[in-house]
Amino acid sequence: EIMPSLVGSEMCIRDRQHINAACGKDTIAYHRDLAGSFMASADNAHAFHPAHAEKYDPKSRVYMNGGVVIKQSANQKYTTDAVSEAVTKMICEKAGVPCQVFANHADIPGGSTLGAILNSLVSVTSVDIGMAQLAMHSPYETAGAKDTAYLVQFAKTFYETTLVRTEHGFSLEEK
């Protein structure tokens, strides 16, 4: 059985191929475009909860109203790598918004995003980001109001910036 999110990811890839074809680009141009692309997969992150401190890695706790969360996973449940984390931090700095880094506690499984599913089908430099929140997937999810403004400002700056692939990663340029 094919997961619905996987079908959506495959559709995203096909749509991108159709757009390239409509613009008169061939398969080589499609792959060149992918190599220079950068994807931000936005979902929320688990904010530190003082009543359950043992469930959090002590060096990567994230807090509500603490800024955009960059999510990483040694098990590759998130798409973030060193390059995409560095680019995201540069965009946050340019946007004037704080950022924080989240990693799951080593012995507690968790995490996975649609970005990781899409990235399993097509290799694009990508980052998993979000806002810190408590009670994820419950009827009483709680997040910080400042984080909404931070994420909006990050997204605005992200879309107003041209990322240029370089030998060592990416550079940021104004559009």
Briefly describe each language-model feature range.
Residues M131-K175:
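His/Asp/Glu-rich mid-to-C-terminal helical/loop segments that flank catalytic regions of hydrolases
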Residues A45-H52, Y56-Y140, T166:
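Active-site-adjacent substrate-binding region
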Residues E10-G67, K71:
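A glycine- and small/hydrophobic-rich beta-loop-beta segment
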Residues E1-G8, C12:
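Single conserved hydrophobic/aromatic residue that forms the stacking wall/gate
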Residues I13-Q17, E85, K89, G115, ...:
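Predominant activation on well-ordered alpha-helical scaffold segments within soluble catalytic domains
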Residues E10-I13, A82, I108, A145, ...:
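Conserved structured core elements
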Residues K25-G36, A95-A106, L163-E173:
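Flexible, glycine/charged-enriched surface loops at secondary-structure junctions
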Residues R16-G24, H49, C92, G96, ...:
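Structural signal for hydrophobic packing residues in well-ordered secondary-structure cores
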